[in-house]
Design a protein with these regions (language model features):
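Secreted/processed peptides and extracellular or luminal domains of membrane proteins
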Residues: 24, 61, 83, 94, ...
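Short, surface-exposed binding/anchoring microloops in extracellular/periplasmic proteins
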Residues: 30-100
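Extracellular and select intracellular beta-sandwich modules with Ser/Thr-enriched
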Residues: 34-36, 106, 144-149
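Solvent-exposed serine/threonine-rich low-complexity stretches and specific carbohydrate-binding patches
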Residues: 100-117, 151-152
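Short, solvent-exposed, Trp/other aromatic-anchored flexible loops in extracytoplasmic proteins
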Residues: 109-133
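Short, exposed beta-strand-loop hairpins at the edges of beta-sheets
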Residues: 125-129, 133-153
Length: 154
């Protein structure tokens, strides 16, 4: 299990590096960013669950201008984080805000009642009505635990 998770993390970092470094003659943009998931505890069915350090929340987005052709977010855990029970009652939301930081659209993910060490969600392609930022957030038992955003500009 540990080597499998370490392999996934290594592959994810390699893909992220490729996406970030790959250039294109067209005006297409790709952004990939990761934010560490802070250690936290929560209760599920009377049991205390602990998420240790070693997990990263990664948000990838592709498109051009206000048009998003691909968007995905998820958690990858390595080392001690891969040994934990994971994230129970989780969901991933995508939110969109204007240049004044006012959220105008939310794509709320489905709440997954199972526990998963590597929760992930993709969102459908779309065209945004305005520039600003696109964010992905991980919720566990209804509490936002980590977010990662990308600015959408001309």
């Amino acid at each position: 299990m540990f080597s499998q998770c370490l392999t996934r993390v290594t592959a994810a970092l390699a893909v992220a590096g490729c996406l970030t470094l790959t250039g294109s003659a067209n005006a297409h943009a790709t952004a990939v960013g990761s934010t560490p998931v802070q250690t936290f505890q929560y209760s599920v069915g009377g049991m205390t669950m602990k998420v240790p350090t070693g997990c990263m929340f990664t948000h990838a987005i592709r498109g051009s201008g206000k048009k998003i052709t691909y968007q995905n977010a998820g958690v990858d855990c390595g080392f001690a984080g891969a040994l934990g029970s994971g994230f129970c009652n989780w969901r991933i939301d995508f939110t969109y805000a204007d240049t004044r930081n006012r959220t105008y659209r939310t794509s709320r993910g489905r709440t997954h009642n199972e526990c998963k060490i590597d929760p992930m969600r993709s969102n459908s392609p779309q065209t945004l009505p305005r520039y600003g930022k696109a964010c992905a957030s991980l919720y566990v038992t209804g509490v936002r635990r980590v977010s990662q955003c990308h600015h959408i500009t001309k």
